[in-house]
């Protein structure tokens, strides 16, 4: 049993909760997720099973797309709807579509962002949420992120009321805190704000419409069709350039054999396959020997090579 499961993560569960539940359903210990989603967030959560856990790091660096909702009028401790109210300021004027689109445009491109106190970012060996739960606030490292697209989904021309909400879609780099973006939007518009709803609609090439629920996974287990829920390792890595080696080279892959970059591939990672179209390893460019590739992750062992 191996491959990537595209889970439609339900609301109220942490990513670790999802891994724990899937281990029980599949009766498989080797399971790991490819990036944390907050409990209140739903949507695409790729989970690696069996030998696929070896490729998890290559799936976490992908860009992510979200659709969500910002509410102006009050902020919270967690920057989302689950936290306690910190500041309230009624929206005492009409907010125009042009203003909202201007705020989104100002946050598009390469920007700096400070992670929220309620996050898993580590400072001095402790996670920020541990400080937050103890009532402490510490200096947080600013990180550089990229917002590839940030668009308003509502078709209204004006927004008004003591609190107002509007929907957005954002495509961003790994490590972006979308709830912090919601706070930053409020700052641009002059009001406290928080993220009132969020769903991840894409993680790299993986889309929400291709995800399955826990109920569907359990149904496949009961029907004996569990293999149908997996995306193969080969398919999950299909975005990387591919090299094919002969049988003799394949046997040496497991020992860390260097390969010549005969195809002059410039992409950072290259998948190496045998003639049976089985992915053996992921290679990268050798930092000291131009034109050579070195293994970054070997996916097969001695026994598997003999099959």
UniProtKB/Swiss-Prot annotation:
Its EC number is 5.4.99.25. One of its GO terms (biological process) is mRNA pseudouridine synthesis. It is an enzyme of class 5 (isomerase). The keyword Transcription does not apply. InterPro entries: PsdUridine_synth_cat_dom_sf, PsdUridine_synth_N, tRNA_psdUridine_synth_TruB, TruB_C. One of its GO terms (molecular function) is tRNA pseudouridine(55) synthase activity. Keywords: Isomerase, tRNA processing. It catalyses: uridine(55) in tRNA = pseudouridine(55) in tRNA. The active site is at 38 (nucleophile). The keyword Isomerase applies. It comes from the Bacteria. Belongs to the pseudouridine synthase TruB family. Type 1 subfamily. Responsible for synthesis of pseudouridine from uracil-55 in the psi GC loop of transfer RNAs. This is tRNA pseudouridine synthase B. It comes from Bacillus thuringiensis (strain Al Hakam). The gene is truB.
């Amino acid at each position: 049993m191996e491959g990537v499961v595209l889970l439609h993560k339900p609301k109220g569960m942490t990513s670790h909760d999802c891994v724990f539940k899937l281990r029980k359903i599949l009766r498989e210990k080797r399971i790991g997720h490819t990036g944390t989603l907050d409990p209140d967030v739903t949507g695409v959560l790729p989970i690696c099973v069996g030998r696929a856990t070896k490729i998890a790091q290559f799936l976490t660096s992908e860009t992510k797309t979200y659709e969500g909702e910002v509410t102006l009028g009050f902020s919270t401790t967690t920057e989302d709807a689950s936290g306690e109210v910190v500041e309230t300021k009624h929206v005492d004027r009409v907010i125009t579509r042009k203003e909202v689109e201007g705020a989104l445009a100002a946050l598009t491109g390469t920007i700096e962002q400070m992670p929220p106190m309620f996050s898993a970012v580590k400072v001095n060996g402790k996670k920020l949420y541990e400080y937050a739960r103890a009532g402490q606030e510490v200096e947080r490292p600013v990180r550089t992120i990229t917002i590839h697209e940030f668009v308003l989904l509502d078709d209204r021309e004006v927004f008004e009321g003591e609190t107002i909400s509007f929907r957005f879609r954002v495509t961003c780099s790994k490590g972006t805190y979308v709830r912090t973006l919601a706070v930053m939007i409020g700052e641009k518009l002059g009001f406290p704000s928080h993220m009132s709803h969020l769903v991840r609609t894409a993680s790299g090439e993986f889309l929400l419409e291709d995800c399955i629920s826990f109920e569907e996974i359990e149904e496949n287990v009961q029907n004996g069709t569990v293999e149908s829920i997996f995306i193969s390792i080969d398919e999950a890595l299909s975005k990387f350039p591919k090299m094919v080696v002969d049988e003799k080279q394949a046997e040496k892959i497991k020992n860390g054999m260097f390969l010549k970059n005969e195809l002059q591939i410039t992409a950072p990672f290259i998948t190496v396959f045998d003639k049976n179209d089985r992915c053996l390893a992921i290679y990268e460019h050798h930092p000291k020997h131009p034109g050579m590739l070195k293994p970054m992750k070997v996916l097969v062992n001695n026994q598997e090579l003999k099959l």
